[in-house]
Amino acid sequence: MKFLHFIFAASIGIYSLSTLQAADLMSIYQEALAQDAQYRSARAAYQAAQEKLVQGRAGFLPTITLSGSRTVQQVDANNVFTGVGNINPQEVTIHGRGAVLSATQPIFRMENIVIYQQSKTEVSRADAQFIVAGQDLILRVAQAYFDVLDAQVDVEVAEAQKKAILKQLEQAKRNFEVGVSTIVDTNEAQARYDLTTSQEIAARNALEIRKRMLQGIIDRLPENLAGAREIASNLTSLRYGSMDEWVRTAEEKNFALKIQQAAYEIAAQEVKKVWSQHYPTVDLVAQYSDQTGVGGAITGRGIDLISKSIGVQLNVPLFQGFSVQSRVREALAHQNRALHDLESTRRSIALQARQQFLNVTNGIAQVKALKQALLSSKSQLDSTILGQEVGVRTEVDVLNAQQQMYSARRDLAKAYHSYLMSRLRLSAEAGELDEEVLKEINALLLL
């Protein structure tokens, strides 16, 4: 029975060791918020897009320009003032200075109105894109986290199997030495031990690769991650009960769909913007000009010329070589493409929502079945060990039962992680994935 106690202790240690002083999913996510280069790039793009509204509003504001000039001119006085006798000096230098202040206030420019409407839509699209980037970060962090947990389970199972098989190998050798078993039992145990050693090496290599992938997100190598101490008993607490409810929610709230809707609106506004070049423009224009220093050395007097003007300027486009008509047709084609892209995105999101809902519901059933399979495999191992002690089971039977129990434990852990990941993806498709949802998933890991 000591061997049986060793098996149970090793199987319990698979989870207890992995959660000792380990980082949980939320702490890894908080690190990713600060360190992930892809998310920081999305944040910079979001900040840049906010300036679109300022740029669009600028079309309603006046433009003011100030220009100045300073000139020096050499004049042949005899050529300029013919018939007045000799002029001294023969060449005259004329100095001039000037300044012009002008302002234009748009009164009606249809193109500027459409540009402003476009800028608001572009900001809305940027908002949705940044939210999608945040949801994508949650999914990438969770997937990398669960990948590491899966790899940890593989390593821990391989270690436990190796220890148990080593124990069995040592027992088989002792039995052979005292003559109560054949060399076949020893060879069988040795073959199993060699196989598990190879599997342990492969599992450790896979774990290192998975950790490096998570390192690419949080910019440090994770040492130890918290896994589930036990499987949650309540796996059915979904916000919506039916698949159709999830699909309707996804079609209303999904942010990838909102991005595509904004793209269609921008394309439609582009048609209006191009067509607006047929419209006249009306501007209020004003100018102040001050020119000094004209004349000077010849007449003995300086001239200071000041002019002021204000008025309304009307520009009516009459003919632009059919370029506007061509660009309108081009914009209409882009609008039509955006409409088809929108419908394609809508169908894809509905499909993804259905798939993730099925993954969640099937995952619940799979986890429950694997929990029962684990209990059954433990009972089978108990019976096999007892059978070996009374002589009705062999060493190979014990090894097979042990292998089946470890496989059931590994499959259960991976199915549970897959179920949790499907819940996150389902929330993302419904447009509801945020930190609160991630906290709920993290709580299911820390039971």
Regions found by a protein language model. Give the residues of each.
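Small/polar, glycine/serine/threonine/aspartate-rich low-complexity segments that form flexible
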Residues: 67-105, 230-239, 272, 285-320, ...
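Periplasmic alpha-helical coiled-coil/stalk elements that build and connect Gram-negative outer-membrane
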Residues: 136-249, 359, 363, 367, ...
